[in-house]
């Protein structure tokens, strides 16, 4: 038999059941309903529902069939007109559980309708979120269970004993079946400290344009929350919250595929289930916000990496430590690492919880789909998400509201994360101020030096111009005495420049004396007489003449140096006696 696609809706007097059976034989179908039971059969489809309210057969029931769409629509009158049926969109919970064909089990769950008034604690009572404390007692090693438990409600164990190699990429903990909860937490904290990168954090902190864009994004629950606050200013009724959240056909198909079952959880395990739900929702809200609702290949990694419940099998004792752990992991692992993003995700999770279990279920279905399409993250569906999708449909709305209030009262600061964020930010601001101060000083200095440098440039240009003018005048004076002497001087100038070396000597008074060594064969090494060269420097000049490769070069403008050499050579040529 096939379970058909179905949908339930209601008005004050009727419950409407729409059943899609495209391949059914329309001429043969049966409908049965009485009290909270509803059954439909049209070969090869069979549907059995346990309704949240009672219906009655009084002659006002109606039925129709749309041949084009293949949909049966059945309207059933309510036993109590005006009564609101809760949880009509929780399709898995509506599917009646399978009855055992064996003997009656030794442990049996008692339904709420069968509970005596004084025997069992009322599930609607206010939930106490404070963990019960007991005196510390030393536990002997022989009493410890080596098979540490994990999964939904800590009901699973032994899963990783044979699949450690295949599933090592899913979780961060090694040998979870032999690692206690305390050891898991110790290793997790050490891994987070080793992974924290101050440079990455400061880069996102100082240059937060991308983070601002992520913070401005409005996910699907933001509009629903605004609508809820507008329409439910006075009271928050379950029927109004359920009407805000709708499920797609794909999500309804997911719900029909889940196996309806019950969970026997003690008080401690029950609390762990709620706490882990917060942790998983925080990771999901972060992923939805940073990707702006567009899933990618990193979505599964982000969710399981940011949730210690999923990657470290962490257990919790209060809401605050969940926030601290989530904040640390956001600043250590994903692409965007900013504390404002942590707080924004925290507020998103509160909104989802306040929207009710329909919104929570929608988030869990999305996580289930992401993990199902990722290898090997699908194992986390078997350990956690599938059970959460079934369990949340039967969870009490009052407890979710109480959980939202407990989360809303919690607070988180940077100092509580234990990563020295405030010290890093203070150091970054100090460096930024120093850089700004140094840049301002360099800018003011350059502005002061600009006029002086321009004046120096103009002064050097004037000196070069005067030097060239003096050289021209000296050349004109030397050309006046006679053509023979000038020709002799110029004939010696060519080889003299090519094969001579100039040594500039400074005397005590700072005067620059020049001695020129003639490069001809007859007079090699003999200094030409210079009018201003003192006689005491004769031996020194002779020694310098023998070592031509040693010279002191003083950089000066080419024009002035050339003019100086020409003037010296011409003066010496005039002093040389004619043959």
UniProtKB/Swiss-Prot annotation:
Single GO molecular function: unfolded protein binding
Domain CS: 1-89
Subunit composition and interactions: Directly interacts with DKC1 alone, but not in the context of the core trimer composed of DKC1, NOP10 and NHP2, nor in the presence of NAF1. Does not interact with NAF1.
Composition bias type Basic and acidic residues, residue spans: 568-579
Subcellular location, record wording: Cytoplasm, Cytosol; Nucleus, Nucleoplasm
Similarity comment: Belongs to the SHQ1 family.
InterPro entries: CS_dom, HSP20-like_chaperone, Shq1, SHQ1-like_CS, Shq1_C
Task of the protein: Required for the quantitative accumulation of H/ACA ribonucleoproteins (RNPs), including telomerase, probably through the stabilization of DKC1, from the time of its synthesis until its association with NOP10, NHP2, and NAF1 at the nascent H/ACA RNA.
Location, primary (coarse class): cytoplasm
Composition bias, Acidic residues: 459-482
Record-annotated membrane-spanning stretches: none
Region: Disordered, residue numbers: 438-492, 550-579
Name listed for the protein in its UniProt record: Protein SHQ1 homolog
Gene Ontology biological process terms from the UniProt entry: box H/ACA snoRNP assembly; protein-RNA complex assembly
